[in-house]
Design a protein with these regions (language model features):
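N-terminal secretory signal peptides and thylakoid transit peptides that target proteins
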Residues: 1-17
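Extracytoplasmic ligand-binding site segments that recognize negatively charged/polar headgroups
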Residues: 53-65, 77-95, 100-228, 232-235
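Extracellular/periplasmic bilobal clamshell ligand-binding domains
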Residues: 316-353
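A ligand-binding cleft/hinge motif common to bilobed small-molecule-binding domains
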Residues: 111-115, 237-256
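Short, polar/charged alpha-helical segment
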Residues: 35-74, 155
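A bilobed periplasmic-binding-protein/Venus flytrap-type ligand-binding module shared by bacterial periplasmic
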Residues: 156-161, 198-199, 269-281, 300-301
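Periplasmic-binding protein-like
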Residues: 150-152, 179-189, 211-214, 220-221, 253-277, 292-316
């Protein structure tokens, strides 16, 4: 049986296996912005492939990969999609076994990038678009990672089952007895989005909120992409959390779903990406990573994937509230990095799953 790795295990394993071959930057020296050059493109095409581990919903990930392949013929992208917490486990296990499959990684749990950076598992590469346009809170000064996507974890409801005037307006409304047996919810042990959201809600509302929610006979699912889909199918009337981008795309297709931005504030989740220090295809990895941060690629994330972007040149979708109009909860990736194992344990104790 494969041993389940905690974040502390990853750091310990990295400390035991780190060598001088890791790509690192001296702390305190800002990384230099890197352009997409003809030389990088040529080197990437010689490698001909790259492996991308991501927690974004598979249909979205495949669209992104195909767009990159169309932009750079001759380079194929292999998409490995799973929940962020599962990706974290997989990379940790591969790392322990000295198997380096992942070239580029994306996680909906920003704390993972902090931990991988601490463990010297990331390569320094700062795309020009990130350095020139992204707010500084959305990229690491050492060039180890940057926010590839932003999303929210709102409440939502099925409009065929719930009238707008009866829908919950905030998280505390979900504790009303009328919602017993009617709520679907994702799991922080699988989803990075939900891990981040759980940390924010536990901090701001207290664990007492989750203790009461656990008594509502919720449908427990894994991925943050699952609650919106269960909602659209009518399997539950309300979702307590989940990926906003999935709700956005379902709604655009005419499914009976509607998001609710909670009066208490809606969890904001950044999804950083990075190039792995041990990437088997380092040039293709850097090219894909740099391309994914361009205004055009970021706009595609929004238009086709329903995500949000930190790139100021990207236009918001007209079919939902602008991010600036949504009251959001404060994200604290460093706190998640330190608290995640305890959060999982506490959540499992409350929800018995």
């Amino acid at each position: 049986m494969t041993r389940k790795l905690t974040r502390r295990h990853v750091l310990a394993a990295a400390a035991a296996t780190t060598t001088a071959s890791f790509v690192t930057v001296a702390r305190g020296a800002p990384a230099e912005a890197q352009k997409i050059t003809p030389e990088l493109i040529e080197a990437a095409k010689k490698e001909g492939k790259a492996s991308w581990y991501t927690s974004v919903d598979l249909p979205v990930a495949e669209k992104v990969a195909k767009a990159f392949e169309a932009a750079y013929p001759g380079i194929s992208m292999k998409v490995e999609r799973s929940g962020a917490e599962r990706i974290f486990q997989r990379i940790g296990q591969e790392y322990q076994s000295k198997i380096y499959v992942c070239d580029v990684v994306n996680s909906s749990d920003a704390a993972h990038l902090i931990i991988w950076k601490r463990a010297n598992m990331l390569a320094s590469f700062l795309p020009e678009d990130v350095a020139q346009h992204f707010p500084k809170e959305h990229w690491d000064p050492d060039g180890m990672y940057a926010s590839w996507r932003l999303t929210l974890s709102p409440i939502a409801y099925n409009t065929s089952l719930v009238k707008a005037e009866d829908a919950p307006k905030g998280f505390n409304d979900l504790l009303d007895p009328k919602w017993v047996g009617k709520i679907v919810k994702a799991h922080p042990g699988y989803s990075g989005t939900i891990m981040t959201a759980t940390q924010q809600l536990a901090r701001d509302l207290g664990w007492g909120y989750f203790e009461k929610l656990a008594k509502q006979k919720i449908m427990q699912v894994q991925s943050a992409a699952d609650p919106p889909k269960k909602l659209a199918l009518g399997e539950r009337a309300v979702m307590a959390d989940g990926g906003e981008y999935v709700i956005t795309e379902l709604k655009a297709r005419g499914e009976p779903v509607e998001e609710v931005y909670a009066v208490e504030g809606t969890p904001l989740i950044t999804g950083p990406s990075a190039v792995m220090a041990r990437a088997a295809n380092p040039n293709a990895a850097r090219l894909f990573y740099a391309w994914s941060m361009t205004a055009a690629a970021q706009q595609m994330n929004v238009d086709v994937g329903g995500m949000r972007s930190a790139h100021p040149m990207v236009k918001e979708r007209p079919d939902r509230k602008k991010l600036s109009e949504v009251k959001t909860l404060r994200e604290d990736a460093a706190a998640v990095a330190d608290q995640a194992d305890d959060i999982k344990a506490h959540y499992t104790k409350l929800f018995k799953v």
